[in-house]
Design a protein with these regions (language model features):
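Conserved N-terminal phosphate-binding loop of PLP-dependent enzymes in the Aspartate aminotransferase
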Residues: 1-381
Length: 381
């Protein structure tokens, strides 16, 4: 029956596309030797938790405050913000947080010799928080000394986003496990991947009866694998990673030039096509009063007065970078052109400039947002 080529039968074999994609993927990741495919970044995190515990025979996991690694139960235990965790406990008992960029806290957390893995984003997605110089390199050294796996979540930063294939390539970091998703298929097909050292996989799948201790039914489906191969071809053929590095640098510099001109804009930071604009309380009286109105409604609401007109007026999609944050995250396409760059700069200049005029249409929008928020929360009639 299987050989009858009937359209209602699924062929029961291993897809050669998975092998081809694994080979192509690892060619961009020196030091990585094995690949496990799954359906999302969250699934990749869950797989990495199991691999790390099996390979080290240790229970504890360490992660950074304000981290985001997904919303399933295991991944949620590594989530650095209570807003996502509250109401879903108890979560994994052996997950411990340390402050971002705090090597002393990490060293103390590793001191007991019972930590399976340290999970870290090379650039934190929530807030686009950059690592201090040497932080990741020293974190690797501390993990090696403690016998702890260094697990890098590159779901947001990987696949060329920062101007390198991996953000950790900027510091030549040799991770034990690397997590990818989203951009691996161009954002169109559910996909995830865990790459890592051979010995970690061998320790986990170490016997015939343990060959199936972890898997995913659709993890290496042909559609996702074909999408991944297509993405790698486009990245290579169109030199999109090089474009992200070059264009991202000029875009960042031009946005940073706005900081001295606008008192609401405190900092612009980023790497490649991963950029954050951070805002803060103004100094002038009229702006302070308007800001206070928004703060009364909910912390961080100001960013919506920038995000909404960027979309409705300029057709630019951005996002508030996290709960109760004054940070807007911009993730332009890696194929960004000079014309696109100019368009983005003009749009931000227009919207941020209008935010500094009181009254204006944007502050009218802010008043509406604040009123709606207060009504929904029961704080306004």
């Amino acid at each position: 029956m299987i050989g009858a080529d009937l359209p209602n039968l699924v062929q029961l074999d291993v897809s050669p596309l998975a092998g081809l994609l694994a080979e192509r993927l690892l060619s961009h990741m020196p030091g990585q030797e094995r690949v496990f495919f799954c359906n999302s970044g969250t699934e990749a995190v869950e797989a990495a938790i199991k691999l790390a515990r099996a390979a080290t025979n240790r229970p504890k996991l360490v992660y950074c405050e304000h981290a985001f690694h997904g919303l399933t139960t295991g991944a949620l235990a590594l989530n650095g913000d209570r807003i996502f965790r509250d109401g879903f406990g108890p979560l994994l008992a052996d997950a411990v947080s340390v402050p971002w960029n705090d090597l002393g806290a990490l060293e103390a957390a590793l001191h007991g010799g019972d930590v399976a893995a340290f999970f870290v984003e090379p650039i934190q997605g929530k807030g686009v928080n950059l690592p201090a110089d040497g932080y990741l390199e020293e974190a690797v050294r501390l993990c090696r000394r403690a016998g702890t796996l260094f697990v890098v979540d590159e779901v947001q930063t990987g696949m060329g986003r920062t101007g390198r294939f991996l953000a950790t390539d900027l510091e030549r970091i040799d991770a034990d496990l690397v997590l990818l998703a989203k951009a691996l298929s161009g954002g169109f097909v559910p996909v995830g991947a865990v790459t890592g050292k051979r010995w970690i996989f061998d320790k986990t799948f170490d016997r015939m009866d343990r060959a199936v201790v972890h898997g995913s039914t659709f993890g290496k489906n042909n559609l996702a694998m074909a999408a991944g191969l297509a993405v790698l071809s486009v990245l290579e053929d169109e030199r999109l990673i090089e474009n992200a590095a070059r264009r991202g640098e000029t875009l960042l510099r031009r946005l940073q030039a706005m900081v001295p001109r606008y008192e609401l804009l405190r900092e612009v930071r980023g790497r490649g096509m991963m950029i954050a604009l951070e805002f803060g309380p103004p100094r002038s009286f009229a702006l302070r009063a308007a800001w206070a109105l928004l703060e009364k409604a909910t912390k961080g609401l100001f960013c919506q007065t920038v995000v909404i007109p960027l979309l409705t007026r300029h057709r630019i999609l951005s996002q508030v970078a996290g709960h109760e944050m004054y940070v807007i995250k911009l993730l332009p396409a890696l194929c960004l052109s000079q014309e696109d760059e100019d368009w983005i700069v003009r749009a931000f200049d227009d919207v941020i400039g209008e935010c500094h005029r009181v009254p204006s249409a944007l502050w009218d929008l802010a008043t509406t947002l604040a009123g709606n928020t207060l009504r929904l929360s029961g704080g306004h009639p």
